[in-house]
């Protein structure tokens, strides 16, 4: 099935489950502990119980390690029995992420 968000991806995602915390939902405040499905150096696909709007910003942090970032919601789609799958683009990363940026 064609999905428009896949056309703009500049990096291949790596399937990897990483425990993370996300926060910053305007209508449902609080911190949500969840996991990634796939990752790259500049973003991740994460599952959430909440519906997010495209271009919303949220706080993203790993449970283990020291990585954190403000992230932009690139897309949000319903995910059966889980809630929603969201594509995140890291905007202000700090610390060590599980995938290093490509050398330029």
Model-derived features: positions:
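Structured alpha-helical
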Residues: 1-104
